[in-house]
């Protein structure tokens, strides 16, 4: 189930994004990016619709994923 990111308080959204970024551990190439930069990137992706917040009833968790990978 999609969760509209706009419905979350700014603090909750920030915490969800930080948790996601810390879990992912993605390699950003030659130059390491700060947590703040990574959070900003994910927030931008949510705002422009490239990424979505998804609630998993099965796992009772919230995740962030590319819109193209989301299947209802």
UniProtKB/Swiss-Prot annotation:
UniProt xrefs under Pfam families: UPF0270
UniProt-listed SUPFAM superfamilies: YehU-like
Where on the tree of life does the source sit, at the highest rank?
Bacteria
List, alphabetically, the InterPro entries matched.
UPF0270 (IPR010648), YehU-like_sf (IPR036685)
Q: Into which family does the record put it? A: Belongs to the UPF0270 family.
Put simply, this protein is called UPF0270 protein YheU
């Amino acid at each position: 189930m999609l969760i509209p990111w706009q419905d979350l308080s700014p603090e909750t959204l920030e915490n969800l994004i930080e948790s996601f970024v810390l879990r992912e551990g993605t390699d950003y190439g030659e130059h390491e990016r700060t947590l703040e930069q990574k959070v900003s990137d994910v927030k931008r992706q949510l705002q422009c619709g490239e990424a979505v917040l998804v609630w998993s009833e099965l796992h009772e968790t919230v995740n962030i994923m590319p819109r193209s990978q989301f299947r209802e």
